[in-house]
Amino acid sequence: MRIDYTERMPQSYKMHSSMCLELKRLVDRIMRIFPDIEDARPGCSSGIQTLCLLHNALDKTKQLLQYCSESSKLYMAVTGDAILARGSRAKKSLEQCLNDIRSIVPTILEIKISQIVQDLRSTQLTLEFSEEEAGKAIRELMQKSTSSSASPDEIKDFHYAALKLQLSTPEAIVTERRSLKIICEDHKQNSFTHHQSIDDSLHANAAEAEASEEHNGTLPEKFKCTLSRTVMYDPVIISSGNTFERMQIQKWFDEGNDSCPISKRKLDDFTLKPNVELKSQISEWCAKNGLDVQDPARKHVKASNSIDFSVSIASFGSSLYNIPDHSGISITDFNSSYSIDSSSYSKMSKGGYFTPMQRIDSASGAGDTDSSHSEIEIDPLCGLTNLPWDAQIKVVEDVRSRFEHSTRAFRSMSPSKFLEPLITYLKNALERNGTAGEIIKGGLDLLLAFLSGNRRAIESLEEEVFKMFSVFLESEVVAEEALNILEVLSNHPHGPSKITSSGSLSSLLKIVESQAEHLQEQAMITLKNLSSSMEICLEMVSLDFIQKLTSFLQQKVFCKHSIIILKNLCSTEKGRGCITETPDCLASIAELLESNVPEEQENAISILLQLCVQKIEYCCLVVREATDIYSSLILISNNGTEEVKVSASELLRALVEVDSDKEEEEEVSSRPEGRTTASPTSQVVTPVTHPEPVKITPSPKKSGLFGFNFSSLKKKKK
């Protein structure tokens, strides 16, 4: 019945990833101690039964995780509530089994189990909002229609759900079809037939719904944009599932609207995804019926010398509207033919440079900039590196000021098309001016805003970019801006390893040890985030950071961050050893037991408990270094928060049992001579005296406060 705790479980999940990752984390912790539970051999019938139940609960949880990594996204979206209930039942079963078994295992193992039980109780399993919305849309769709073919409205609803579930690429659709086929074969029922027909309609894209119109020469309504009532040249799908002409829906958003023009549903995601299949159908129909559809953006480009090219050059180079070059003149030709003077810079700084829907008056050729400029601009830095240096500075400042309070707009921008020119700009600024001046500050502020609004862009940052941040940390001028960026990066799964490999860790430690108070706390927050990585913890220990953390605790500064970092360092064997060997470290940690901040108390107890669980020698050191630890723990057990009470009681029990074992060993060693003697080479342990505990009515299980045996706290009567 022994479980192979090295068994691999899925690392990624198609759906309900937040719930699955929480369950996987808990299962991993249980499987690591399961061999120890088996070795404890709970011999009673109830113990064996509980062990079997725990085995079954683990198997069911792992089956759920495997299911969420392999099954159909659509099916899991529809049955999301059932899957959540299944996960909650699995968590409850694990909690119940561990709670029953911890009373029949040794104390050290009981403490480990208690920590897992506490974590199980505090863990809340939830579904992602987008998945709930997609499931709701599909369920409503399945209830609306019972016919074999889907109507256009149903297709729109399905597009909305498919976008939410990221079923927008051919590869994703093929994988989904295979998963659906497996489910249909397993169920052997007709209840899923309608769901399968909806999936097929994704590929047909409602072609059947309007087949008659296409064959009789009548222009299908689906080819027309709802906003312009004209045939679409570049159809795009928005997050509501409806399709529009790219230029028209972009204009709709530019005017400040944040809802779908058809469904009136408020949108959080303003991404525009090309409807390739519909465009292909439109092209085929137009070719068959002799209709020529013109690009609606052509009327916005006039190949005339009267145009103010300082305003139009950015939109000319942008790929957002696919503006054709009728004059055959390249961007380089424009740069060489038309100089950008100071008046052009002033127009850029006023926001006229990157307005995406630039309207040009046909009579005067002057640019008419909409006052309510877009929040969803695409590639605003396109062509940045082709401009003169002074113009680049103006452009970066213009974009920074425009999006300063609207980082949501960055979600729809391409990371590569935004980051590449901006990183190149920062490198050039570093080569031209070093780390001095406001030029780099503006670039770093813009980079921070972009990474904060578009977190997926962090994955595309190369290691050389992180090395550049390390250089900026060494500068007093831009260190604060670099720290702001590193704090964001340290919170991302792909950030910590690259930060460490770039050498920024030592720079952060230098800032912490410096006298720059305005930077110290921010550096501590970043280090706290980085300490969640075990590899970085080992490097922090090697750099002797624990001594600095100890001094912070003694000085009562940055205690909140310091104790969390120490807690993370304590998760490694090297960190535990260094904490016990660093002078005054244990005493400083124990002093936080008297803190008025529950979080600091809880983290301090967690560190001491981790140490006591690992080695008896650590328990002895805790008792020796931490004065009045017993009275502090008793006080917390009575007056602390519920979570702190549990941890304090467990730590108290561990310390008391170690003291009891020591007394028994001393008694046995003293019996042959009739009195206690100590050899010259033996270690002399100074007895720690504590006040007599309050006597209470003994429980059937154990005597003493909270069921603990406090004989070790009393003086032995000879």
Swiss-Prot record:
InterPro entries: ARM-like, ARM-type_fold, RING-Ubox_PUB, Ubox_domain, Znf_RING/FYVE/PHD. Residues 218-292 form the U-box domain. The keyword Plastid does not apply. It catalyses: S-ubiquitinyl-[E2 ubiquitin-conjugating enzyme]-L-cysteine + [acceptor protein]-L-lysine = [E2 ubiquitin-conjugating enzyme]-L-cysteine + N(6)-ubiquitinyl-[acceptor protein]-L-lysine. It comes from the Eukaryota. GO terms for molecular function: ubiquitin-protein transferase activity. PROSITE patterns: U_BOX. Residues 662-704 are annotated as: Disordered. Keywords: Repeat, Transferase, Ubl conjugation pathway. This is U-box domain-containing protein 5. It comes from Arabidopsis thaliana. The gene is PUB5.
